[in-house]
Amino acid sequence: MHKARLRGHCARAGKSVRLASSGMTRRDPLTNKVALVTASTDWIGFAVAQRLAQDGAHVVVSRRKQQNVDQAVATLQGEGLSMTGTVCHVGKMKDWERLVATAMKLHGVIDILSLSITNSKRGLFWFTLLQTAEEAWDRNLDINGKALALMIKAVVPEMEKRGGGSVGFLASVAAFRPLPGFSPYNVSKTALLGLNKTLAIELAPRNIRVNCLAPGLIKTSFSRMLWMDKEKEESMKETLRIRRLGEPEDSLGIVSFLCSEDASYLTGETVMVGGGTPSRL
């Protein structure tokens, strides 16, 4: 049923596919903006897609599996939000091209790119330096570094046609305070801080802003091994100024702000959302 609904929605691409989002009670800072959100069928990515649509954007979600895309689209359309989706494996160039082409076919423009990419092969980053195989280094740096850069490269020409845009992606508190036993992950997330600064400089003349979010310990499937163990959870809370673990929703206002015109003079910034986790001066 969900697949049929998504196919039916995409089949109407020749007509207006911009559904009017309903039930909003606040100003819509992203009205008529078009946003691509990767890895957006669950957890933080899903919450980001939902919030951007609630704030007025027309959102294209993506994930590796069609059934997950269909379910997310059906759920969010059911809330009266303007939502479409397509399959996208961030490690495959053809999938990036299809994601961009889908957005352009449906909406004609791209204003926002939100990259919520996580390495899905969890066993490839829980290692120290001496335990880490070459495959783990390749996988982490490919997904958390190269794939993001190339995805942004694919979108920039379309943003330029629009006169500019906003790019955002996720680093981690581990970029500032490395997690013991997560060497490949720590290094790949630290690399994103450099990517953020570099692209902010390169893309500013094109009126494209680039900013980064660095979440702390947020309750997601990635961190499940920590918060599902009550003893570990309590130990983690001791490192926080705000004595609770984060929820995906804790980042949403900041993401929407960074994508909006309210942040038009912000680029190259990394915002920590970590409950006061000690991370830098």
Curated annotation (Swiss-Prot):
<comment type="function">
    <text>Putative oxidoreductase.</text>
</comment>
<dbReference type="InterPro" id="IPR020904">
    <property type="entry name" value="Sc_DH/Rdtase_CS"/>
</dbReference>
<feature type="active site" description="Proton acceptor">
    <location>
        <position position="185"/>
    </location>
</feature>
<dbReference type="GO" id="GO:0042574">
    <property type="term" value="P:retinal metabolic process"/>
</dbReference>
<feature type="short sequence motif" description="Peroxisomal targeting signal">
    <location>
        <begin position="279"/>
        <end position="281"/>
    </location>
</feature>
<dbReference type="Pfam" id="PF13561">
    <property type="entry name" value="adh_short_C2"/>
</dbReference>
<feature type="binding site">
    <location>
        <position position="172"/>
    </location>
    <ligand>
        <name>substrate</name>
    </ligand>
</feature>
<keyword id="KW-0560">Oxidoreductase</keyword>
<keyword id="KW-0520">NAD</keyword>
<dbReference type="InterPro" id="IPR002347">
    <property type="entry name" value="SDR_fam"/>
</dbReference>
<dbReference type="GO" id="GO:0004090">
    <property type="term" value="F:carbonyl reductase (NADPH) activity"/>
</dbReference>
<keyword id="KW-0521">NADP</keyword>
<feature type="binding site">
    <location>
        <begin position="36"/>
        <end position="60"/>
    </location>
    <ligand>
        <name>NADP(+)</name>
    </ligand>
</feature>
<protein>
    <recommendedName>
        <fullName>Putative dehydrogenase/reductase SDR family member 4-like 1</fullName>
        <ecNumber>1.1.-.-</ecNumber>
    </recommendedName>
</protein>
<dbReference type="InterPro" id="IPR036291">
    <property type="entry name" value="NAD(P)-bd_dom_sf"/>
</dbReference>
<dbReference type="GO" id="GO:0005777">
    <property type="term" value="C:peroxisome"/>
</dbReference>
<feature type="binding site">
    <location>
        <position position="189"/>
    </location>
    <ligand>
        <name>NADP(+)</name>
    </ligand>
</feature>
<comment type="similarity">
    <text>Belongs to the short-chain dehydrogenases/reductases (SDR) family.</text>
</comment>
